[in-house]
């Protein structure tokens, strides 16, 4: 397979400037990740451990096979969205740790409530993150392990947590349907499990509860007293002894957190789970070029072009790419490669999308679907070309072919936004709405319906036409005063931290970690069979 040769000079001033700019962004990302990893803060953590409980991340660590990685989902979910009175983040990590890890040799989705964050209660973004984890489990046919320690819905936010289709109730809907599909559901009750949340263990295939610590009840002692006048302790109402000896809601009684996690590992060991997909996996080889050089590839000035092959060469095995149609539709690079020995089809932006690029992309997607090869999209796109000439040539029709191919492709799809993600280009390059198994962003990325300058210019033109149509005038200073806040709005709303807080992605990643993250996602996808693709009608 042809080896991609780098034309970059890592000793050049431009490379050094680019690398310094990216390194600053990565340092900021790491700092934010360190903060949210602490959960609810020192006081809450001390209170948690004083009760004999392991900290949430320690629970996850003990559940995993020793030395194996944890592919965490959306660690910065809810960032700055629910500020406390002092301005600090009230819901770091959205109050729940979620991701994919190996347990007793089996890839599993783990959802772990963080009771140090507002008692593990569910904010709107907590629900969204929990549902996203279940979606990952369903798509990849991964057993779910729920480490439950939650006070249920966050009551001040109940209108955004309880009533709608994709609110709290959807968790239990998903549990029931995944169980029906043979996707194991295992609950470990390590603290409170109240009200509707009680259905997490009650609807699991197998449930473990920690004695004198875990509780399960639809109505807690205060509600029971208010409703019936009965005075009862939490343990007598819904403790481990009650539910493993009398009610049968739980199956195994653990003596402490460590024992409970050991029982969970035993439960997974008896699932008789095997990977389903039949990819032709070969021996992995490291790229010939250093991943750390990715820092210097992307220009600090986003207006400067670069060759996306420089990025591909630092991600794929042996820096090898068998490029498809290299002389046609040059603004889209397509080709076959391997990542940690797993075959992939790469689709990477190298400029704006023209009709030729879109047709090439659609053709390549057809090939990958026929061969059942996963697709990897490297997004850096301002959109499809516009103008009278390209419209006459059918850019909408040809762009629709690519969008249709992306939408209907049944192979696992993975998207990494390495630069811009604007307008319909987001759709053609497998944005969130098009169901990629995972979508990550680099810290330099931007995502909006269009760029801030373009949006400000469009709206300013509309306003100027309205003023002048009524016989008025609009000075250059007035126009700039109108456009400046729009630019600021688009910059703020298109920023990766704004996006990741709202779960528009599965996390912001260090560019140097791209290959590792992609390999973990690909490996997880091998647990599900790859379905045949049936394309819709292509307008010819």
What do these predicted ranges mean?
Residues 1-540:
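Ligand-binding clefts of soluble mixed alpha/beta catalytic domains
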């Amino acid at each position: 397979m042809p080896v991609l040769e780098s034309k970059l000079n890592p000793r050049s001033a431009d490379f050094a400037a680019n690398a310094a700019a990216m390194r600053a962004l990565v340092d900021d990302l790491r700092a934010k990740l360190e903060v949210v990893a602490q959960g609810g803060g020192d006081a809450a953590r001390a209170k948690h451990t004083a009760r004999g409980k392991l900290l949430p991340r320690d629970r996850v660590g003990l559940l995993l096979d020793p030395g194996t990685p944890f592919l965490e989902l959306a660690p910065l979910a809810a960032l700055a969205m629910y500020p406390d009175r002092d301005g600090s983040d009230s819901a770091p990590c959205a109050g729940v740790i979620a991701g994919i890890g190996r347990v007793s040799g089996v890839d599993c989705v783990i959802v772990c409530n963080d009771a140090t964050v507002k008692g593990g209660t569910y904010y709107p973004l907590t629900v969204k993150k929990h549902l996203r984890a279940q979606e990952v489990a369903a798509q990849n046919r991964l057993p779910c392990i729920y480490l439950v320690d939650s006070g249920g819905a966050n009551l001040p936010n109940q209108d955004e947590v309880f009533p709608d289709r994709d609110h709290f109730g959807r968790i239990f809907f998903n549990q029931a349907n995944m169980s029906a599909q043979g996707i194991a559901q295992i609950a470990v009750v390590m603290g409170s499990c109240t009200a509707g949340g009680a259905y997490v263990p009650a609807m699991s295939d197998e449930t473990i509860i920690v004695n004198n610590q875990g509780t399960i009840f639809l109505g807690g002692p205060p509600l029971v007293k208010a409703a019936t006048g009965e005075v009862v302790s939490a343990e007598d109402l819904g403790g481990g002894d009650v539910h493993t000896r009398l009610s049968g809601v739980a199956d195994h009684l653990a003596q402490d957190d460590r024992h409970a996690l050991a029982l969970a590992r035993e439960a997974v060991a008896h699932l008789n789970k095997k990977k389903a997909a039949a990819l032709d996996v070969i021996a992995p080889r490291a790229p010939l070029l250093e991943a750390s050089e990715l820092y210097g590839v992307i220009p600090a000035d986003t207006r400067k072009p670069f060759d996306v092959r420089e990025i591909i060469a630092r991600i794929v095995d042996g820096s090898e790419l068998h490029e498809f149609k290299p002389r046609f539709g040059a603004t889209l690079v397509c080709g076959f490669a391997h990542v940690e020995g797993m075959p992939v089809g790469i689709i990477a932006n190298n400029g704006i999308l023209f009709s030729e690029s879109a047709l090439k992309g659609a053709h390549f997607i057809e090939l990958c679907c026929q061969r059942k090869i996963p697709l990897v999209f490297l997004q850096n796109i301002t959109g499809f070309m516009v103008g009278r000439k390209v419209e006459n040539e059918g850019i909408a029709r040809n762009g629709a072919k690519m969008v249709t191919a992306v939408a209907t492709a049944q192979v696992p799809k993975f998207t990494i936004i390495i630069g811009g993600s604007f307008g319909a280009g987001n759709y053609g390059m497998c944005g969130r709405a098009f169901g990629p198994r995972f979508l990550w962003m680099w810290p330099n990325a931007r995502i909006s319906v269009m760029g801030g300058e373009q949006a400000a210019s469009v709206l300013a033109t509309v306003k100027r036409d309205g003023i002048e149509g009524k016989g008025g005038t609009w000075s250059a200073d007035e126009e700039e005063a109108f456009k400046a806040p729009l630019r600021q709005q688009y910059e703020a709303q298109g920023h990766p931290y704004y996006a990741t807080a709202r779960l528009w992605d599965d996390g912001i990643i260090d560019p140097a970690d791209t290959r590792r993250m992609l390999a973990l996602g690909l490996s997880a996808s091998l647990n599900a069979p790859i379905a045949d693709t049936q394309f819709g009608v292509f307008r010819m």
